Amino acid sequence: NPNHTTPYWGIGHPKYVVPSATTESDMTPSRIPGYDGSASLIVPQAPSLASSSSNTSLGAIGIAISGAAIFNDQEGNGALDQAAVTLDYTGAHIGPQEYHYHLEPRAWSDDDDDLIGIISDGFFIYGRKCNATGTYPTDLDTSGGHTSTTEHTITAEYHYHIINEIYSTTASYIVFAGPYQGSPNAVN
């Protein structure tokens, strides 16, 4: 479960906030207190690039630093467009079984180089800016990845960024659509 405010905590919870990016009637019917938000992800200490990339799938594809799951740009059997109205101010909602982010988690990252979380192939994902340059990286691969230093490293290493492209009509940015550049493990 996330460590920040959201309307998905439900009225009466200390972290509940009134919806600002959606409305109560547009929100998914579930609320966080009814779910066990625990998850585990085992990744190599030093992840490596795979010989070929692989597509992300439905469900959790990573874990954010807030403790909630990261999902790709799909919702059910289609694009996120129709479900975008259910997303809270931080680009997340509940469904089918957990609170998760699809869009840049504005609870702690908004157009910056902050750590977002870890993707299930073991590579970290950061905000839209590069810590090494202080600007939007111009050398990203199709997954939003490149090799440079980060706020947590002194030597250059491969990592992902939220790609600086507005998603559809949301005025926000997808956290990670993929494909994976490493070998993914399951988030359980």
For each of these PLM feature ranges, what is it?
Residues 1-79:
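Solvent-exposed N-terminal domain segments of exported/luminal and surface proteins
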Residues 31, 91-92:
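Short consensus segments that form the blades of beta-propeller domains
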Residues 39-46, 64-69, 95-108, 153-168:
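Extracellular/lumenal glycan-associated surfaces
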Residues 43, 90, 143:
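Short clusters of hydrophobic/aromatic residues that line enzyme substrate/ligand-binding pockets
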Residues 51, 70, 107-111, 125, ...:
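Short loop/beta submotifs within extracellular cysteine-rich repeat domains
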Residues 78-88, 95-136:
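Short helix-loop boundary/capping segments
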Residues 138-188:
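Long, compositionally biased interface segments
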